[in-house]
Amino acid sequence: MVTIGNAHEDLIHDAVLDYYGKRLATCSSDKTIKIYDIEGTENYKLTATLTGHEGPIWQVAWAHPKFGSILASCSYDGKVLIWKEQQDTQQWSIIAEHTIHQASVNSVSWAPHELGAVLLCTSSDGKVSVVDFNDDGTTSHVIFDAHAIGVNSASWAPFTAASSTSSKDANTLKQHRRFVTCGSDNLVKIWKYDTALETYAEEAKLEGHTDWVRDVAWSPSNLVRPYIATASQDCTVLIWTQDKDGKWQSQPLTEEKFPDVCWRCSWSLSGNILAVSGGDNKVTLWKENLQGKWESAGEVELIK
């Protein structure tokens, strides 16, 4: 395990490895992003410090390497910045700025690469925006109302084998765009692209939490059935599954509530392990047993 000390001058809000697990991007309330090369299991090297935001930076997201060394970031300043590293100079620069939100942008998430270079953004203004980075260098976006008093996070549905058998033209691929959002209205919503309306339509509304839903994560594996995890300020994590009739059902991850607010939830790449972090400063791991119940799979030891 690599431990990086004194990385930022203020709270660190996100830390994300790239596709290959060789580079780490971190972001902080100090308004900077730092890029590290990870060398083995113990060594690291700071290679860049990126400045451009005017407020705390909440989240960063690496694009798939097929699009190059590209990073998206979002901030309290209401901006989404797209950064690109020039391979010859290894210098980072801002190549796009997304400024259509009227409040803090709380999360950014790249679509499955099969769907193209598409970025999903959520904001405290209650809206969600989806930005397309087109092959000709232009961008286009759709923005719509999602959660009246603020959207906290979003997660794309995985690109399925059934999707991949259809045509690869842009309009057909748009039909396979599907994602889930969560908000300060205690709700979780699933959205799908509507080709007739040319925007995203609400497919389902999931009710189960009694306080703000802070994070949502769609499992990257749909081999058995879809799984969505939601973490809430009500100190619970819910696991949502879809039955054969298309209805969504939820079950609590644990019988007892967590000791504090649940901030984040994240699936392993294989989709069988769920990590949960909360206000108790712990990261716990969970796995579904053969009876369909969720049980502890350990705890990540944090350096204090």
Swiss-Prot record:
One of its GO terms (molecular function) is structural molecule activity. InterPro entries: Sec13/Seh1_fam, WD40/YVTN_repeat-like_dom_sf, WD40_repeat_dom_sf, WD40_rpt. It is a peripheral membrane protein. Its main location: membrane. Component of the coat protein complex II (COPII) which promotes the formation of transport vesicles from the endoplasmic reticulum (ER). The coat has two main functions, the physical deformation of the endoplasmic reticulum membrane into vesicles and the selection of cargo molecules. It also functions as a component of the nuclear pore complex (NPC). NPC components, collectively referred to as nucleoporins (NUPs), can play the role of both NPC structural components and of docking or interaction partners for transiently associated nuclear transport factors. Belongs to the WD repeat SEC13 family. The COPII coat is composed of at least 5 proteins: the SEC23/24 complex, the SEC13/31 complex, and the protein SAR1. Component of the nuclear pore complex (NPC). NPC constitutes the exclusive means of nucleocytoplasmic transport. NPCs allow the passive diffusion of ions and small molecules and the active, nuclear transport receptor-mediated bidirectional transport of macromolecules such as proteins, RNAs, ribonucleoparticles (RNPs), and ribosomal subunits across the nuclear envelope. Due to its 8-fold rotational symmetry, all subunits are present with 8 copies or multiples thereof. This is Protein transport protein SEC13. It comes from Lodderomyces elongisporus (strain ATCC 11503 / CBS 2605 / JCM 1781 / NBRC 1676 / NRRL YB-4239).
